[in-house]
Amino acid sequence: MTASVSSPSENITIDFSLEKNGIPTYSVMQQGTAVIQPSSLGFEFQNQPELTGGLEVTGTDTNSENETWEMPWGEQRNVRNRYNELVVHLQEKEAPNRMLDIYFRAYDDGVAFRYHFPEQEGIDTLIITDEKSQFSLTGDHTCWWQPGDWDIYEHLYNTSSFTGIDATTKRDHPDLNSSYIPENAVNTPITMRTADGLHLSFHEAALIDYAGMTLRIDPENMRMESVLVGSDRLGYKVKRGLPFSSPWRTIQISEDAPGLIESKLIVNLNEPNRLGDISWFTPMKYVGIWWEMHLGISTWDMEGTQDMSTFTTDQVTGSKHGATTENAKRYIDFAAENGIKGLLVEGWNTGWDHWIGFEDREGVFDFITPYSDYDLEEVVRYGR
């Protein structure tokens, strides 16, 4: 079974296919040229058998949208949201006959797809151990990438061919304290340029109540596969009650690099503003109790052990807690005298003593309990 959907200008087409063994796949064409080769889709679960095949199509729907909405905050006031959509309804041929819907949207500046698990008998919660979304490339493209670090987005970008990507070489960075790169994967967005000059960017949108996505690099098969950021403490990636939808998996497509920046694909796929009136949002400068920890003047923790020298050897520990009530007031005075509207404070809450250099640091912060030398209410009162 096959089905297709094209963008409004018909320059981009998504083709859906169900292989003989019931594996859902998709491919993408731009101006009649392949951009994404047939790529499979599916899931692995902790509380259910994997859902990667044995499916049949029970129906399809098509939709179109052409609207203009006002961006509450950003670089462009009015944004056009124009796409064609294909919804494929799937169900297992055999028990437990689980149902899965896949939504495909074709825009003039790219494509997106997401999964939807409808309400169904016998399943109220799904515990996802991994998502098996593949992106099969058409060549050894030039790539701009960051390693798939589960903790941070603080690495520099690298430029290489796709087959030249090796994120594991970025492990144990001497200047990054909380870094975890479990395999050869990249954080999104990863941006590519094909031999013909076509520019691609792979990312996600509407990331709500779901694990973030990295992309495993498979140079032998010229393919990427989604790897959800996990938790050793929990032992799974996502736990959701039905019905629910995954984030959108996005591919922005442009003839040149500026077109990727001009693309509004991501914001069109994100949820509309839920806050209502945001006219009170105003830009501001702020100062922070933060950089002094990097300079070794003070520490994040009250115990006096956690500053930049905790994982570098060319500095002397400050051993003096930075986020104290007294220091915060000093920063507030400086900000007020210089017309600076905000103050950022790091290290005010308990848990920092078990952060840098600890493999079991997950969950050490409750983001509620202050250290005894930081009076949160007094700092707020003084700032007002």
Residue ranges and their predicted role:
Residues Y115, D256-P258, E292-L295, N349-W352:
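Solvent-exposed loop/turn segments at secondary-structure junctions
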Residues S246-P247, T282-M284:
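Short coil/turn connectors at secondary-structure junctions
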Residues R80, Y103, L242, S279, ...:
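Catalytic cores of large soluble enzymes that bind and process phosphate-bearing ligands
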Residues Y286-G288, G296-R384:
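Substrate-binding cleft of carbohydrate-active enzyme catalytic domains
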Residues W144, F202, G288-W290, W300:
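Tryptophan-centered motif/residue detector
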Residues S4-G276:
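N-terminal accessory beta-strand-rich subdomains and adjacent acidic, glycine-rich linkers
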Residues A257-G276, W280, T325, K329-I332, ...:
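Carboxylate/His-rich catalytic cores and anion/metal-binding grooves
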